[in-house]
Structure formats: structure tokens, C-alpha cells
Amino acid sequence: MAQPDMYVRQAAALPLRNGRVCLVTSSNGKRWVIPKGLIEPGQTAGETALQEAWEEAGLLGALDREPIGSYLYEKEGLRYHVTVFVMKVTAVAQDWPERSFRQRSWVSPTGFFERIEEGDLAEIVRLTVLQHAEEHLAEA
């Protein structure tokens, strides 16, 4: 496996509100994705995740301190390493920077798994859902 510095680094937000996940259409409008983008020089992964959630989906909120995982993908000959953070959404704007070419959809966890094509991302989310369920059972 290639070293992480041989990948283009990206960060993503997994936006959650009222038990639902926010998805947006990809830049070409053909797939449903979570907000993500390139980590710019001088920016942390968390800052990037929050910025992309705002630009792509019009969402404001707070990230969990630690990422829930990461996944790899290839596109147009480049390899990407995406760090994923859970985002607790506190505000949803009716207008946002990329509104003119992205759709936003709130889906149940089941709907998320039906729409997301990146298998590694789906696995990260599946494990997170299971972990949260176990924590709630332990508290009961």
C-alpha cells in the first residue's frame, strides 16, 4: 500500500441531525455523497470538513473531536485519502455557496446505505452506527 503522503488529502463531514444524515449530489450531479474537499495548506482536516459542509450543503455545526475513520478512492488517475468527521448540525441555511448546482437530501441511516456508492465510507458509517447502538444499550 502506498504511503499516506502519496495521496491527495481530503476531509469530509458526516452531517447528522434528528437521526438523519445529510447527503449532497456530487459536483457532476450523478451520485450522492457527503460534503468533502481538499485540505488546503495551513488548514486542518476539521476546518476543511466544516468549510465543505457549509459550501456544499449550507450546514453549520460542530464536529466530534476525533475522526470516525478514513477511506481511499481513485478518480481521474489520482488517489485520495479522506478523513471523515461526524458533524452535529445546528443550523441549515436556505441559501449556500453551491446551492445552484447541488441538491441536499436528509436520509435515514437505511437511506444512506442505499445511496452511497463508496463501500469503505459505508463501512465506516456502519461501524459508527453499531458503536452508538452498543453505547446506548450499555447505558440502559
Q: For the regions a protein language model found, what residue spans apply to each?
A:
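N-terminal strand-loop-strand
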Residues: 1-34
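Short, charged/polar surface micro-motifs in flexible loops or helix N-caps
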Residues: 20-21, 28-31, 40-41, 88-93
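The catalytic Nudix box helix
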Residues: 34-67
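Structural detector for helix-capping/boundary residues
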Residues: 37, 51, 107-110, 119
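Active-site-adjacent beta-strand/loop module that shapes the phosphate/pyrophosphate-binding cleft
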Residues: 70-95, 105-107, 120, 127, ...
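Short, charged, solvent-exposed linker or helix-capping segments at domain edges/interfaces
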Residues: 94-100, 115-118
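Charged phosphate-binding loop/patch that engages nucleotide di/tri-phosphates or the phosphate backbone
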Residues: 114-140
